[in-house]
């Protein structure tokens, strides 16, 4: 699902028929400040001129020389570059088929305890970018002699994401659940039915939806048949707030995402 913390990230959100209009039908917008992000850290380092990310899937290991280098197995990009800007800043960029797919500028604070990242996600098939900033707290230092941005970092909810990465819509019509986003990601799935195709996201290819109660939908997302994440989405009694419990199977993370009806 196009979860709205990239990805935090990137990122990107993910029975019985409903007789009256479903409480899910409508446009929703994620609330970054109200959400609870995973406490599992991300780990990367620049050592001896190489950038490594051990928590990336697949693991990344490229020269940090500003040039693009091949990446195999990532559905969103096939090349990546890492540039050391100064002792506290690096820039990362990615592209797929020669076309830019994303970039980020990462800066560590003067005291070395926090990390700020300004990003642009250009993976949307319709060309609509998602931009934003994230802030992380240091969990552990990087290897001796590594760049100051190196280490283990835990995400916080102190960040901003453009509306293109926060807004999504549901339309429940009988047993059919339709999902769409400004970045062109969409599906139409039958409640309790087989996996339905997802369009507009190369890393999310199909989904299933069940409805254990009128106010709850459970969406399970897949990439080429492998489970990515499970979203258990519940709408509040007043119909204004959606709480999504996210079990990110691929990255082993759990989070709670909050969205409000627009």
Label every model-predicted segment.
Residues 4-15:
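Sec-dependent N-terminal signal peptides
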């Amino acid at each position: 699902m196009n979860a709205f913390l990239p990805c935090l990230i990137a990122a990107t959100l993910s029975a019985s028929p409903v007789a009256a209009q479903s409480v899910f039908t409508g446009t929703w917008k994620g609330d970054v400040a109200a959400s609870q992000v995973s406490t599992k850290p991300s780990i990367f380092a620049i050592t001896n001129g190489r950038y490594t990310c051990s928590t990336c899937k697949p693991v990344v290991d490229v020269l940090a020389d500003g040039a693009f280098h091949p990446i195999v197995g990532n559905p969103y990009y096939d090349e990546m570059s890492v540039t050391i800007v100064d002792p506290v800043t690096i820039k990362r960029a990615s592209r797929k088929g020669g076309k830019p797919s994303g970039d980020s500028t990462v800066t560590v604070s003067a005291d070395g305890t926090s990390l700020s990242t300004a990003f642009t996600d250009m993976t949307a098939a319709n060309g609509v970018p998602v931009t934003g900033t994230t802030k992380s707290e240091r969990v552990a230092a990087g290897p001796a002699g590594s760049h100051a941005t190196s280490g283990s970092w835990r995400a916080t909810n102190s960040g901003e994401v453009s509306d293109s990465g926060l807004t999504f819509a549901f339309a429940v019509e009988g047993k059919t659940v339709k999902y769409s986003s400004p970045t062109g990601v969409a599906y139409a799935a039958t409640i309790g039915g087989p996996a339905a195709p997802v369009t507009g996201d190369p890393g999310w290819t199909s989904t299933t939806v069940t409805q254990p109660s009128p106010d709850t939908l459970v969406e399970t997302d897949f990439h080429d048949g492998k489970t990515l994440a499970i979203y258990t989405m519940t709408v509040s009694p007043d119909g204004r707030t959606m709480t999504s419990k996210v079990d990110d199977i691929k990255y082993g993370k759990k989070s709670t995402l909050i969205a409000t009806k627009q």
